[in-house]
Each structure stands twice: as structure tokens, then as C-alpha cells.
């Protein structure tokens, strides 16, 4: 039986305990933007939006505007100070307040009627604003008033009232209004100058690319969950100019990052918190100082979760009542047993995730049985939270997933629903909050995991999930996730590829019971242990690796909890001065913490192109081969069992022994996996992983410092500090193991100056209490060192060893397509479905260029497309992605490629050949040639099926040419 296409519950209790309407929202076709905005305003209870804002000159400054007209504050008529609050009065009756909360943080509040009584967000979005005394001053500079702090100079222009912000030097601009903030009906808009190379990030969990320059982003709940939609919007963004802003509102809006940048919300007020800093990381720190730091999840929450309905016999259940092994809630225990029998790491279940599923009483028996197998239990809010005190306090459930009616139309309703779920856990146990939600907002990072909603198990969905989950971190959302292989459809191949990279994010989950096809005979189970080989073993490999990396990933989430900097990081966070890292050329990869670079494979191909390695040394995790960045790595061999994974030079990565769930065995030996290069360090964070005792100081830290040659031969020294701090369960002492990735065997290894014995084999090393062994065949060289248990500080030194030599990367790179334009296509389908030629380079593999086919007599082959690259490039490679919609017509077979400075004379082709008749991505190496124009000529159709040509994406590699 097909269920509604969005997993939602029937009528249930709202956050206040009242019953709400039955919520069985079905997946809808895309709706025009105007209709979406009207719908968003309706559910928010706001007035319909007025017309688009007119130029400021359309109405006299400060004049009372008729309904629907555009108004501004007018000219400044007064300026007063009370403490660190500066009030500006304008000629039209409006007032503005600048409230300096810290030298780098201030609030700008504009009230059109001068009352400052309308504050719908209250302290929900900005719970912490008192940072103590702030040294501020002001002066009258003639044309403007100047408010200064130790970090900023805020200018209040007098005629008309406009604002701008500069650094403390009063010359370096941070942001500047290009015209007065205006309001039209129920909509208020701010206009900012856009810098020549200014880039923008943020806006919450946006399903697509994270670099936003040139994009218009709705800040509105839409519950549609396709590319470029909003799973959890946030009225926050930050800029490479060194600032971020959070609009203090529940109203939907839209941010256009063009020139000028226009920032609109559907309310007749302007209220914003500004955060400044010398880096994106410092801006995130300031933003989360005010809106709340990301919560600290329990360790089991980092493990794989599994959601499904195991109570199919419930008459209210809207799914298949005959699902095998899913009749009553205790059936979930059998699945837990399957996981352990398959030696598969996993940490929690949601056994009631399905319309009308409910659970079989007594719940405690099931919770206890799962706990005995190392699983925690969470519950979907299909029955509301009316019983959460008993479910948490008596039965022992520890997680909540909110959905549909519980989050209603989003905004404050959803925010309060999540907060009530948090209270339900923390007021009835000593456990930490662990809540999953959609429709988050600014501030949700302190309470919940946000996930991408109901998505599909396709290569295309996987492609945009990478920047979506990565980009969420640019709004302080440390825990952003998506169902592994989606909720609908999927295949063993897409499942395994999706699981690989999501294992390097803090939180991830499977959702079973909804797939059109599935790996287990029609029951659509998406647990990793339900697959056949080779998928079973590959899934296990990456889940086991995540468990081993738990101390590293957990520490990175502690960093997020302290600083707002997420553990899943866009490349720009680690490399803000690298122009390549600032934009979407790197949106298909990310940093897991500060040391691991993950480049997911998101197509049905064993080859990964376009991996960008920034400045520094990068080591292939699997082979040990080292590369010298910056540069692009193409042709990386990535069969199904290989995720492209690179380790930064100098990395110090703590690792647990292998286990299938937290607490399965004691961490009697802690491994530090080290890629020595120069000077580096790591500060390990540990606590009990379960309770809230860490909030009162129950945790420990251990610092590790490494010195090594930057290149060549020398001594590698590892200094391990004594753990500081305490928590329940902290080991009194423990052994340590070090895996040093070096190229040659050492002359000596010492522990605090005393020689450590070298051992002749890995087997001898494994059985010894201490010693060292060098294996040149292990990932191009690994030095294994084992030390006895201790609670104190110690130093290990390996003399006479060498760090691996790093291979240079090619100088060519993917050519930015943002300036490309269509010059000519001999044929394109415009009368029927997707087919416009410009779609061959729109960055969306789901669209395509297709030559005309709806006419009675389609044009014959050959076909061609000509593209203006926007500038001259030395082109050395072409990428061709055939259509990805399941169709086969038009795949290019025989081809020729031309590059020229003019479309009047192409000269001879720089490449020719024949592409295979498959949907996989294709590449063609070109004889390097400089030019501004590309011509791709399709000579034949790969399958000989007809006179057509099609292309999902055309890409090029090369470098700028003079």
C-alpha cells in the first residue's frame, strides 16, 4: 500500500497540548514563488505582502505613506544616548535604536511608529545579550553621527537616515546602506552595497549550494525538500566582509545577494542583531554567543539511527498491516539482534515512525531489550508529547523526532514544539537533549538536529545533499542530516555511497518502509545490515570507521559547542583566504573537523574528478600517497568501497578501539593516528557521553603536541599531556598507541628518553605490552608505537625517520561556469519538456539540453553547441554528463571539441573520440589550447537510436589565459 508521500501523522497534540488538524500533507508540484509567499504569510497569520518596494524617491521622505506605498524614516531630527542605547528620531515619526551589547555585537531596531513595542521574537532568538559593560562613545561628524566601540565605528547618516558600519579605523567598510530602509505595506527592506568580491553564506539548512552571491534565497518554510528549497531556513547570513546579521523576527522573508543586496521580511519593522569579526569563524562565535551555542549531543546520537514502524498491527497504522517482523513494537528487538549478528555498528531506533503507528505497551520492556543490545530508543511525535514524562522517566526513551502537526506551519510554532520536546527529555531524566526536526529557525542549533525532509535515493539528491548539509554549518547548525539514501526509492549503490560520506557527519539516520524498491524483497528496509554483499561489508567498513573516529568527531562537536564552528565544515571556513574555497567550486566536498577532507562520490562512476586540495600536504587515507596543494586532483580511482578521503599534514586524530556501540568495551588503549609535518597539536575532549554533568565541569581534556620535519628526515616528537579534569567513568589510566605516517623506519624510538624495543613483525607487536614496528607496505609507511598504561604526561620520540614526499598537483582546475553564456545551438527542444541548450551548463544534472524532438521531422545529426566562457582560458579537459533522468536518447557517441578566440574560425578540433553508451560521466583530455569559446560537436548518437543529442552537464578544466 502506498502511503502519503510525506511521512506525517494524523491529528495530534500541538505543543500546548491542544489537538490540531489532521496533517497528511502530500508531496506537491512546485508552486510559483508568489503563491508560496502568499501561503507562507497565510500560515504565519500575517497580512498579504504588498507590491515590490519602489525607489525611495517615489514618496517624499518622512511623509505618511498611503497603504501599499513605499515609505522611509526621513531625515534625522534627534539623537540621544542612554547608557549603551542610542536613539535616533526621524522626521516622519520613526525612531531607530542602536544597542551596543559588546564591542563586536550590536542591535539595530527601526520602529516606523517610534514605539518599540512590537518585539514578537522576544528572547527566543537572542537569549543572551548582556555581556557586561561596553566602552562606547559618540560624536557629531557633521553629515553623520558616529558611535564607536573598541571594534567598530557605526555611522548614522542624517539626510536621509541611513546606517553604515566600519572597522575601528573608521575607514574599512563592513557594510553600508545604499538607500534608506523602506517599508511597503507589510514588508520592510534594507539595501546594502555589495563588494566587488564579497561572498555570502548562511540562511539555514538550504538544499543546495552554500555560496550565495548572485542568488535570491527565500527565508521561509516551504516543506518541499527539493534542490534550492528550505528544510530549516534561518534569518541569518554572514559575509566575507567580516560581519553576520540575524533578523530578530518570525516573519518570512527573502534575501537577494545581488548589487545592491536586498534584505526583506514580511513585517512593518526592522530588528536585527549584527556580529562582526576578523574571520567567518569569529562571526559564527559571536552569532552563537547571542542565539545559543550548538547543543552537545549524547555519544549514542553520533551513531547510526534507524526509523521505521514496528507496530503494523495497530488498526490506526496507515501502512501495510502485514509487514513481516513489524507486527508489534517488540519486533524491533529482532532487528537489533540482526545488526549485532552482522557485526554492524548502530546506536538507536525510532520504532514508531509511521502514520498511526504508535507503540505496544509496555514500552519499557522494548526499551530495556534494545538497551541490552546497545541501542537507545527514541520516539516519533505521532502521538504528541502528552506521555513524554512517562516515556522518558519510566520507560527510558531518550530521543524525540518532531514532525508535521507538532511543528505545524513552522516558525515560532515549530520552535516551541522542539523546546517542549527538549524539556520532556531533560526534565524527566539526567539525559541530554536529542531531538530531530524540520522547519528549524535561527536558534534551533541549541536544541535540535535538523534534517532535509523527505528526499529520494538518487544520485542527483545525493549531489545537492553534500552542499546542503555542509552549508547548514555556516548558520551554526552543527547537527544537520538527511535520511541515508532518502526515504523514497534508492538502490544498494546509492545507499552505500550516501552512507560513506554521511558517516563523517555528526548525526545520521535511515528511514525504512517507504521506498518504491528496496534491498530486502519488497519490505523496503534501509538498515545497512539488510543488504547483500558487497554492500554489506562496505557499509560495515564505514560504520566501523566512524566508531573508531568517535573521540575525534566528538571533540569537534565540543569545539562547535564552545565556538559555533561546525564539525562539518565548508572549505571556506578552514581556508577563508583561498579564492577557490570561497565559492561553490568546492561545494561538493567538505572538511570533517579540521583534519579530514571528504570528497563524496555522487555519481555512478568509479572515478572522482574535481577534488580540490588547498595549500599544504594532503595524504590519501587509504594509500598513504601524499599530495602538495593547492591544486586539483582529477581521475581519482574510487571504486564502490572507496570514499575519497584525505588527511591534512600535521593531523593528530584520536581513535577508539573497534566497537559497535558506545560503551561496548572500555577504552583501555587510545590510539593517536598522526600525520607528522611541522608543528601541530590536538586537544582531546572527553566526558561521560550521556548526561548533562558536563555543564557543571564534569569533563576532561588531554593535549597532544607533535613536532616533525616539514620535509625530509629528522625526529618526530609526540608529547602527551596528563589528562586534566574529571568525570564519571574516566579511566584511572590507559595505554596509548601511535600510528605515525612516515616514509622510513626510525633509527630509535624512545619513551621519556628510554629506548622502546623494536619488534620484528606486526604479530609480535600486537602481542607485546609495548614496543614499535615499522611496516613500509601499510599505506606507504606506518610506524606503530605502543606505550604502557599511565595517568601522567609522557613523550615519545622517533629519530632518523622521514616524512613522505608530496607529489605536485596539476595546475589546471575546473573552470567557473558562472560567467558562461550560450552562443549557438543548432537545435534545442523548446516546445515540449526540458531541452533548452543553456541547461547543459546550469549546474543542475537533473535538467538537460535536448535537440528538438517534438516536431514531425527532427533535425539530423551532427549537432553542436557553442558556449562563451566569459574570459580566455587555457582549456585542457572536457567533462560530459549524459542525461540523468533515466532516459537514453541523445547520448553523445562520436564527438569533436573545438576551442577558439572567435566563433568565425574554429580551426581543427582539439579532441575527438567516441563516448560509451552509458549514463556515467565522461571526460576527454584536450590538447591544451587557449580561447574564449567552446564548440562541442556531436557526430553520432551513442546507441544509434535516433538523430538526437542531449547533455545534462558540460564542464571544462584549465586555467586563466592572458
Give the location of each predicted region.
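Catalytic and substrate-binding clefts that recognize carbohydrates or anionic sugar/phosphate headgroups
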Residues: 90, 129, 135-309, 318-322, ...
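A low-complexity, Ser/Thr/Gly/Pro-enriched, surface-exposed linker/loop concept
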Residues: 65-79, 83, 99-143, 184-187
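Predominantly extracellular/luminal regions of secreted and cell-surface proteins
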Residues: 551, 661-684, 806-846
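Substrate-binding cleft of carbohydrate-active enzyme catalytic domains
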Residues: 264, 272-440
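Catalytic core of carbohydrate-active enzymes
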Residues: 423-424, 444-449, 468, 474-482, ...
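Short, well-ordered beta-strand segments enriched in hydrophobic/aromatic residues
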Residues: 88, 98, 108, 145-154, ...
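Aromatic, loop-rich ligand-recognition surfaces of beta-strand-rich domains
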Residues: 806-809, 835, 842-909, 915-962
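Secretory targeting and sorting signals
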Residues: 3, 26-63
Amino acid at each position: 500500500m502506498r502511503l502519503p508521500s510525506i511521512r506525517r501523522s494524523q491529528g495530534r497534540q500541538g505543543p500546548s497540548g491542544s489537538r490540531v488538524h489532521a496533517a497528511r500533507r502530500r508531496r506537491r508540484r512546485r508552486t510559483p514563488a508568489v503563491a508560496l509567499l502568499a501561503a507562507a504569510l497565510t500560515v504565519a497569520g500575517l497580512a498579504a505582502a504588498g507590491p515590490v518596494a519602489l525607489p525611495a524617491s517615489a514618496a517624499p521622505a518622512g511623509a505618511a505613506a498611503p497603504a501599499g506605498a513605499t515609505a522611509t524614516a526621513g531625515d534625522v531630527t534627534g539623537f540621544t544616548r542612554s547608557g549603551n542605547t542610542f536613539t535616533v528620531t526621524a522626521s516622519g515619526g520613526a525612531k531607530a535604536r542602536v544597542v551596543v551589547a559588546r564591542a563586536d555585537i550590536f542591535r539595530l531596531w527601526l520602529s516606523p511608529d517610534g514605539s518599540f513595542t512590537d518585539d514578537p521574537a522576544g528572547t527566543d532568538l537572542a537569549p543572551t545579550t548582556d555581556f557586561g559593560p561596553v566602552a562606547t562613545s559618540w560624536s557629531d561628524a557633521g553629515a553623520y553621527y558616529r558611535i564607536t566601540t573598541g571594534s567598530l565605528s557605526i555611522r548614522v547618516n542624517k539626510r536621509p537616515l541611513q546606517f553604515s558600519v566600519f572597522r575601528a579605523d573608521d575607514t574599512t567598510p563592513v557594510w553600508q546602506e545604499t538607500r534608506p530602509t523602506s517599508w511597503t505595506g507589510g514588508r520592510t527592506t534594507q539595501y546594502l552595497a555589495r563588494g566587488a568580491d564579497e561572498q555570502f553564506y548562511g540562511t539555514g539548512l538550504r538544499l543546495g549550494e552554500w555560496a550565495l552571491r548572485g542568488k535570491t534565497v527565500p527565508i521561509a518554510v516551504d516543506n518541499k525538500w527539493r534542490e534550492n528549497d528550505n528544510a530549516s531556513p534561518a534569518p541569518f547570513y554572514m559575509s566575507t566582509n567580516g560581519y553576520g546579521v540575524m533578523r530578530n523576527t518570525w516573519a518570512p522573508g527573502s534575501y537577494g545577494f545581488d548589487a545592491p543586496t536586498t534584505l526583506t521580511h514580511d513585517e512593518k519593522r526592522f530588528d536585527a542583531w549584527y556580529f562582526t569579526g576578523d574571520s567567518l569563524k569569529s562571526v559564527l562565535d559571536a552569532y552563537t554567543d547571542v542565539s545559543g551555542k550548538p547543543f552537545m549531543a549524547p555519544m549514542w546520537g553520533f551513531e547510526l539511527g534507524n526509523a521505521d514502524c514496528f507496530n503494523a498491527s495497530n488498526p490506526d497504522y496507515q501502512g501495510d498491516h502485514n509487514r513481516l517482523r513489524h507486527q508489534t513494537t517488540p519486533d524491533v528487538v529482532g532487528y537489533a539482534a540482526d545488526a549485532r549478528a552482522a557485526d554492524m555498528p548502530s546506536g538507536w531506533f525510532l520504532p514508531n515512525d509511521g502514520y498511526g503507528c504508535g507503540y505496544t505497551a509496555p514500552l519499557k520492556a522494548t526499551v530495556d531489550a534494545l538497551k541490552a543490545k546497545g541501542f537507545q530508543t527514541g520516539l516519533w511525535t505521532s502521538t504528541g508529547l502528552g506521555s513524554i514524562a512517562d516515556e522518558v522517566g519510566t520507560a527510558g526513551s531518550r530521543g524525540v523526532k518532531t514532525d508535521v502537526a507538532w511543528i505545524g506551519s513552522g516558525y515560532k510554532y515549530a520552535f516551541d514544539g522542539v523546546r517542549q520536546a527538549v524539556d520532556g527529555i531533560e526534565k524527566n531524566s539526567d539525559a541530554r537533549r536529542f531531538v530531530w526536526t524540520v522547519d528549524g529557525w535561527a536558534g534551533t542549533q541549541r536544541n535540535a538536529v535538523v534534517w532535509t525532509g523527505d528526499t529520494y535515493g538518487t544520485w542527483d539528491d545525493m549531489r545537492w545533499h553534500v552542499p546542503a548539509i555542509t552549508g547548514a554549518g555556516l548558520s551554526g547548525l552543527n547537527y544537520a542530516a538527511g535520511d541515508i539514501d532518502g526515504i523514497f526509492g534508492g538502490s544498494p549503490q546509492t545507499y552505500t555511497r550516501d552512507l560513506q560520506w554521511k558517516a563523517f557527519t555528526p548525526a545520521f539516520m535511515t528511514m525504512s518502509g517507504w521506498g518504491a524498491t528496496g534491498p530486502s524483497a519488497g519490505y523496503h528496509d534501509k538498515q545497512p545490515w539488510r543488504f547483500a554483499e558487497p554492500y554489506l561489508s562496505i557499509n560495515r567498513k564505514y560504520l566501523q570507521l566512524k566508531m573508531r573516529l568517535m573521540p575525534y568527531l566528538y571533540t569537534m562537536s565540543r569545539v562547535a559547542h564552545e565556538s559555533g564552528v561546525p564539525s562539518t565544515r565548508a572549505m571556506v571556513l578552514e581556508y577563508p583566504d583561498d579564492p577557490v574555497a570561497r565559492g561553490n567550486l568546492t561545494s561538493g566536498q567538505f572538511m570533517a573537523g579540521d583534519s579530514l577532507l571528504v570528497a563524496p562520490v555522487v555519481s555512478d562512476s568509479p572515478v572522482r574528478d574535481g577534488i580540490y586540495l588547498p595549500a599544504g600536504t594532503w595524504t590519501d587515507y587509504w594509500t598513504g600517497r601524499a599530495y602538495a596543494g593547492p591544486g586539483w586532483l582529477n581521475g581519482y580511482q574510487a571504486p564502490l568501497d572507496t570514499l575519497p578521503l584525505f588527511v591534512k599534514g600535521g593531523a593528530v586524530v584520536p581513535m577508539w578501539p573497534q566497537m559497535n556501540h558506545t560503551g561496548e568495551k572500555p577504552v583501555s588503549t587510545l590510539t593517536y593516528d598522526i600525520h607528522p609535518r611541522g608543528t601541530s597539536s590536538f586537544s582531546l575532549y572527553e566526558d561521560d557521553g550521556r548526561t548533562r554533568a558536563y555543564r557543571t565541569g564534569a569533563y576532561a581534556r588531554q593535549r597532544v603536541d607533535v613536532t616533525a620535519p616539514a620535509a625530509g628526515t629528522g625526529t618526530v616528537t609526540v608529547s602527551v599531556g596528563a589528562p586534566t579534569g574529571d568525570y564519571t567513568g574516566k579511566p584511572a589510566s590507559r595505554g596509548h598507541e601511535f600510528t605515525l605516517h612516515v616514509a622510513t623506519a626510525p633509527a630509535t624510538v624512545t619513551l621519556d628518553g628510554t629506548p622502546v624495543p623494536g619488534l620484528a613483525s606486526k604479530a609480535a607487536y600486537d602481542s607485546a605490552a609495548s614496543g614499535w614496528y615499522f611496516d613500509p607496505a601499510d599505506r606507504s609507511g606506518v610506524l606503530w608505537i605502543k606505550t604502557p598504561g599511565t595517568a601522567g604526561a609522557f613523550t615519545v620520540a622517533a629519530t632518523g625517520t622521514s616524512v613522505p614526499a608530496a607529489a605536485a598537483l596539476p595546475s589546471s582546475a575546473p573552470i567557473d561556469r558562472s560567467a558562461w553564456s550560450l552562443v549557438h545551438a543548432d537545435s534545442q527542444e523548446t516546445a515540449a519538456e526540458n531541452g533548452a541548450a543553456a541547461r547543459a551548463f546550469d549546474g543542475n544534472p537533473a535538467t538537460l539540453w535536448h535537440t528538438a524532438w517534438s516536431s514531425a521531422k527532427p533535425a539530423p545529426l551532427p549537432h553542436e553547441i557553442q558556449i562563451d566562457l566569459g574570459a580566455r582560458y587555457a582549456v585542457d579537459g572536457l567533462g560530459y554528463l549524459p542525461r540523468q533522468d533515466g532516459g537514453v536518447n541523445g547520448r553523445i557517441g562520436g564527438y569533436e571539441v573545438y576551442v577558439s578566440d572567435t566563433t568565425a574560425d574554429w580551426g581543427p578540433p582539439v579532441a575527438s573520440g567516441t563516448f560509451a553508451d552509458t549514463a556515467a560521466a565522461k571526460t576527454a583530455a584536450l590538447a591544451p589550447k587557449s580561447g574564449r569559446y567552446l564548440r562541442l560537436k556531436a557526430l553520432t548518437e551513442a546507441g544509434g537510436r535516433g538523430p538526437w543529442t542531449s547533455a545534462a552537464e558540460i564542464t571544462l578544466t584549465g586555467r586563466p589565459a592572458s
